């Protein structure tokens, strides 16, 4: 039986990303990993990744810029948010897991298990 292949966007210094990656390996996933620090997502990549989804879900509410700009109260436009995320990869909620057109933001063991079935 072949291993499930996933695309994993992460920051190696992120504890949650490390836990998620270890969990994926335990589940037997074949991981293609992208370090968002070394290889940030371009505006067009973010637009493609977000697609029809709510762009606000991709914003990390823990990020300093998110709090400084009070994005919870005054969310940026989709275009502005995507430009900000492209220039500030830490503003992107992570990790991002992509498999067969399905996307998961953050780390949720049950959701990961379900996606890999």
Language model regions located:
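Local sequence-structure signature of Cys/Sec-based thiol-disulfide redox active-site neighborhoods
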Residues: 2-27, 31-36
